[in-house]
C-alpha cells in the first residue's frame, strides 16, 4: 500500500517511521519548511527506545500527486480543512482516510470533503515528541482503536488494522469506537486545558482539592453532552479512567501546556472543551465549566498575541 501521513509532527513521524519498516510505501506530508528540509537532507532522526536515522520521502501536501491507498490524518485540528483541501487530488475511489486527531467533531469536517465510504475514525494512546526539525523522540508503547464510518465497509477497517499491526502499532478494529474517542477527549478536557491555564503538571492539578472538583465537573459535562448525542458513556468508568491516567502521567505537562505556555502556539481548545460547549448549546445543555475554560484559553491566546 501507499500510505501518506498527513501532518508529520511527532505522532505522524512515529506512525510514518513504524509503517516504513513494513512492506508498504510511506510519504510524509507537512508544511513546516525546516522540518521538510531537515528530513530531506539528513533523514528522520529517531531517538528514544531506538536510535536510528531513516530516509523517508517528505513533501508539502499540495506537492503530492500519486493516488493514496491510505491517508492517516495527524494534522492539528484547526488545520484539518486546509489539509483535506490540499490532498483532494490523491484521494481515489478506494482511498481509505483514517483520522487519529485528538478532540471531537472531526468526522463532520471530513465528510465535507470525503465520502463516508472512505472514512475511518480512530483514537490512539501512542505518544511521541519532536526534539526539533527532523528529530523524533519515540518512547514507550501504545495502542489504537479504529472503525469504518460506513457499516457496509468494515473490510476496509480490518485491512487498515492489519497494516498497522504489521508496524507493531497494536491496532484493534472496534465495532463502536465513538465512546473511546469521547473518553480520550475527556482526558484532554480535564488535563490539557486546565494545566495550560494553571501552568502546572497533571500531578499538581490532581493534588489540589479545587483542581479535582473542577476535573469532576468537566467529566460530568462531557458525559451528559455525549449521552445526549447518543454516545454510550459511563460517568463512573470515565472518572476512574481519568484518575488512573493522571497517576501515570503525574509528572507531565500536557500538550496544550506545551503549545500555549511554552511555545505560544494556538491551541485545539475549540475541539475539546469548546466542542462540548458548542454541542451543549445546540442541545440546550448548560456546560459552564467547559465554556469558561474555552473562553479563558482564548483570552490567554489573545494576551500572548498568538495568531
From Swiss-Prot:
Report the domain of life of the source organism.
Answer: Bacteria
Which cysteine residues pair off into disulfide bonds? none
Q: Which InterPro entries match?
A: 6-PGluconate_DH-like_C_sf, 6PGD_dom2, ApbA, Ketopantoate_reductase, KPA_reductase, KPR_N, NAD(P)-bd_dom_sf
User: What is this protein called in UniProt?
Assistant: 2-dehydropantoate 2-reductase
Quickly give the catalysed reaction: (R)-pantoate + NADP(+) = 2-dehydropantoate + NADPH + H(+)
A Pfam family name for this chain?
Answer: ApbA
Q: Does the keyword Transcription apply?
A: no
The protein's organism comes out as: Streptococcus pyogenes serotype M1
- Could you name the active-site residues? 184 (proton donor)
Task: Sum up the protein's function in the record's words.
Answer: Catalyzes the NADPH-dependent reduction of ketopantoate into pantoic acid.
Localization terms from the record: Cytoplasm
Cellular component (GO) terms are: cytoplasm
Q: Which UniProt keywords apply?
A: Cytoplasm, NADP, Oxidoreductase, Pantothenate biosynthesis
User: Which residues are listed for NADP(+) binding in this entry?
Assistant: 7-12, 102, 128, 268
Q: Where does substrate bind?
A: 102, 188, 192, 255
Q: In which pathway does it act?
A: Cofactor biosynthesis; (R)-pantothenate biosynthesis; (R)-pantoate from 3-methyl-2-oxobutanoate: step 2/2
Biological process GO terms, please?
pantothenate biosynthetic process
The UniProt entry's sequence similarity note says: Belongs to the ketopantoate reductase family.
In terms of one coarse class, where is the protein primarily found?
cytoplasm
Enzyme class comes to oxidoreductase
Q: What's the Enzyme Commission number for this chain?
A: 1.1.1.169
Please give the Gene Ontology molecular function terms for this protein.
2-dehydropantoate 2-reductase activity; NADP binding
Amino acid at each position: 500500500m501507499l500510505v501518506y501521513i498527513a501532518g508529520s509532527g511527532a505522532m505522524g513521524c512515529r506512525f510514518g517511521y513504524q509503517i516504513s519498516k513494513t512492506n508498504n510505501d510511506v510519504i510524509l506530508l507537512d508544511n513546516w519548511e525546516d522540518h521538510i528540509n531537515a528530513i530531506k537532507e539528513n533523514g528522520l532522526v529517531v531517538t528514544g527506545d531506538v536510535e536510528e536515522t531513516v530516509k523517508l520521502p517528505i513533501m508539502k501536501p499540495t506537492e503530492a500527486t500519486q493516488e493514496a491507498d491510505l491517508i492517516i490524518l495527524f494534522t492539528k485540528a484547526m488545520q484539518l480543512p486546509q489539509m483535506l483541501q490540499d490532498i483532494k487530488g490523491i484521494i481515489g475511489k478506494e482511498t481509505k482516510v483514517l483520522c487519529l486527531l485528538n478532540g471531537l467533531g472531526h468526522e463532520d469536517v471530513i465528510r465535507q470533503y470525503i465520502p463516508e465510504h472512505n472514512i475511518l475514525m480512530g483514537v490512539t494512546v501512542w505518544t511521541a515528541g519532536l526534539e526539533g526539525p527532523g528529530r523524533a523522540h519515540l518512547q514507550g508503547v501504545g495502542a489504537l482503536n479504529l472503525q469504518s464510518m460506513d457499516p457496509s465497509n468494515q473490510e476496509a477497517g480490518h485491512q487498515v488494522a492489519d497494516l498497522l499491526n504489521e508496524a507493531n502499532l497494536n491496532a484493534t478494529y472496534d465495532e463502536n469506537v465513538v465512546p473511546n474517542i469521547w473518553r480520550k477527549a475527556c482526558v484532554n478536557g480535564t488535563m490539557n486545558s486546565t494545566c495550560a491555564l494553571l501552568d502546572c503538571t497533571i500531578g499538581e492539578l490532581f493534588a489540589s482539592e479545587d483542581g479535582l472538583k473542577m476535573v469532576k465537573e468537566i467529566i460530568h459535562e462531557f458525559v451528559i453532552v455525549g449521552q445526549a448525542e447518543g454516545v454510550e458513556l459511563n460517568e463512573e468508568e470515565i472518572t476512574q479512567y481519568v484518575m488512573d491516567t493522571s497517576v501515570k502521567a503525574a509528572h507531565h505537562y500536557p500538550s496544550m501546556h506545551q503549545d500555549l505556555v511554552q511555545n505560544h502556539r494556538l491551541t485545539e481548545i475549540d475541539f475539546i472543551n469548546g466542542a462540548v460547549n458548542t454541542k451543549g448549546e445546540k442541545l440546550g445543555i448548560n456546560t459552564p465549566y467547559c465554556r469558561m475554560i474555552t473562553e479563558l484559553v482564548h483570552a490567554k491566546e489573545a494576551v500572548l498575541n498568538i495568531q
